[in-house]
């Protein structure tokens, strides 16, 4: 519901003071372009190599191939995978796949990065490295990162504000 891919049955979703429920389709698409997502299972295109996976959202936006590849290479450095540019997802570890997914999410310069159980499929050491990367991205790009997780260790490690939602109800929030 945060990105309004699904409409909430009740309440409001406010992003930068805008109630997404009041926006028309064109305005909603524009607002969604400021929100990127990473998922538990990476959602990489298996038939595309790493650089093409990262370029994919830029291709959809009509960015020229040379410019898209330059941006993708810059993001590969950010996530520490510059040597994996030509690898395919099947050749990567889970942590490397998640780093590619993060780079792809950052390609369109979002204001908000929505992480839906982004570390739950990873081992503890890889989870720690992904959380460090997310902290670095938050500081470097000044992106708001929203983490959806059931892992309390993730919350303790990275979150500076917490909201607990149970059965669709906000039951607790704070610093």
Question: Can you annotate each of these PLM segments?
Answer:
Residues 1-141, 145-154, 158-159, 164:
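ABC family nucleotide-binding domain
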Residues 173-174:
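ABC ATPase "signature
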């Amino acid at each position: 519901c945060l990105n309004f891919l699904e409409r909430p049955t009740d309440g409001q979703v406010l992003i930068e003071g805008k109630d997404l429920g009041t926006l028309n389709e064109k305005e909603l698409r524009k607002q969604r372009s400021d929100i990127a997502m990473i998922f538990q299972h990476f959602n990489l295109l298996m038939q595309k190599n790493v650089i093409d996976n990262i370029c994919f959202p830029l291709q959809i936006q009509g960015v020229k191939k040379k410019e898209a590849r330059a941006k993708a290479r810059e993001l590969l450095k950010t996530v520490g995978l510059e040597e994996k540019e030509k690898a395919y997802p099947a050749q990567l570890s889970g942590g490397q796949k998640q780093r590619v997914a993060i780079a792809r999410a950052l390609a369109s310069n979002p204001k908000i990065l929505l992480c839906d159980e982004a570390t739950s499929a990873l081992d503890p050491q890889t989870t720690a490295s992904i959380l460090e990367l997310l902290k670095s991205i938050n500081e470097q790009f000044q992106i708001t990162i929203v983490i959806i997780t059931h892992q309390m260790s993730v919350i303790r490690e990275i979150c500076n504000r917490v909201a607990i939602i149970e059965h669709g109800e906000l039951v607790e929030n704070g610093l």
